[in-house]
Amino acid sequence: MTHSTVTHTRKANPSAWFRRNLGKIIAFLFMAVLAVVWLMPLVWAIASSFKTSMEAKQYLKYHNILPIKWTIENYQYVFSTATTPIFQWMRNSFIVSISQTVLVLFLTSTSAYAYERLQFRGKEGIFWTVFGLSMFPNVVGLVPQFQLMNALRWLDKLPSVIFPGVTGVFNIFLIRNFLKSVPKDLDEAASIDGAGAWRIYYQIILPSIKPVLTVVALFAFTGAWNDFVWPSIALTNPKNLTLTPGLRLLQVSEGGSGGGGHVVRQLAGGVI
């Protein structure tokens, strides 16, 4: 009797386990399908960069994702043509993105520290006023921003792309809210020991907010790297362009938006 009961329980275990984990299985399958859907454009772009121009033009005929004939001619063209100095663009993009990220981390963390920890008159009103003004779309400030860069004689130079992006009210808001979880007792103890505001910021606040600073750094770097509109306006010399508007120049150098040759070469530049 006992042996029969144990055997029956063992046989029922897989079914019971399946019922208990049905929700997790469905969620896993849904996320797997979602991941495939999100990855397909990336896979298609990378694979298409190895296609010939003729095959790219005949995509609707073959409907193939992987190339019929693999070739690296698109990468050879991107690296060899004088009209598209892609290594210079990549260098400019790294300079702009890294410089902007460092400045964003310093300015937003110190601003958040001041708004959250220091006491001064009208700080809440100032913060929420600036936060409200940030709700306007960025395109509203393009003309004043252009005039300011022109007055500083920074147009067509990398500083004109670096400095307009070093502020970010959302990042200040993010760091400030994270700072609320850091006990103020640490500040008070350091203050009793004779530490000033800058020492408290450097030795206590910064080590405590490393997780949110990592997030802000990722936002700042990817935002600067992917920026297209403002670098296209501020930079006119092809050698001074960053990578994103440079890819547009690659399309123009290929003679417009028609055909498939320039498409696969743009994809090669994008993959690089």
Please give the residue ranges for each predicted region.
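A structural signal for multi-pass alpha-helical bundles of membrane permease subunits
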Residues: V6-H8, S15-A16, G23-I272
